[in-house]
Design a protein with these regions (language model features):
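Mg2+-dependent endonuclease catalytic cores in nucleic-acid-processing enzymes, primarily RNase H-like
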Residues: 2-125, 146
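Acidic two-metal-ion nuclease catalytic site recognized across multiple nuclease folds
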Residues: 141-152
Length: 152
């Protein structure tokens, strides 16, 4: 597909209390699920504020013979830039997602702007799934310019 369309393939949300070992196990189960369904993963981008957890994910990947999987810090572009890129793709019918993206669909449908402010700021008060939105945005933010500059 190149940069013609952005396609959400699969999403999961785990709301239970997780310790680092649980996180590593669930992460590797997700990696296996994605590779079984779609063939391969080249990179995973994580919230840079979680360096200890990122090191744990790298260790878990290496222990499961997935040491070639790039697990790196997200670029963390401005949130509004990520949102505007995504909404532009939606407006141009350039965003698709599979039936395996129920949690992403829910997160996108519940995202709202913070009320009572003139600034465009996404509401982050626990009423919507910001973690899924951030994770999804981290997956395409490094390529935003390529998506926005794509000409058919």
């Amino acid at each position: 597909v190149g940069y013609e369309k952005l396609v959400g393939l699969i999403s999961e949300l785990h709301t239970e209390e997780l310790d680092p070992e649980d996180l590593n196990r669930l992460f590797m189960e997700f990696v296996e699920k994605v590779t079984d369904l779609f063939g391969f993963i080249t990179a995973v981008y994580c919230d840079s504020a979680e360096q200890v957890l990122i090191r744990g994910l790298r260790t878990a990947a290496a222990q499961r013979n997935k040491g070639d999987l790039k697990i790196a810090n997200a670029k963390k572009n401005r949130i509004n830039d990520r949102i505007f890129c995504f909404t532009s793709l939606v407006a141009q019918n350039r965003f698709l997602y599979t039936e395996l993206c129920e949690t992403l669909e829910d997160a996108l449908s519940m995202a709202v702007w913070k009320p009572d402010t003139v600034e465009l700021e996404r509401l982050d008060d626990g009423t919507s799934d910001i973690d899924t939105l951030d994770g999804f945005e981290y997956s395409y933010e490094r390529d935003m310019k390529k998506y926005m500059n794509h000409v058919e």
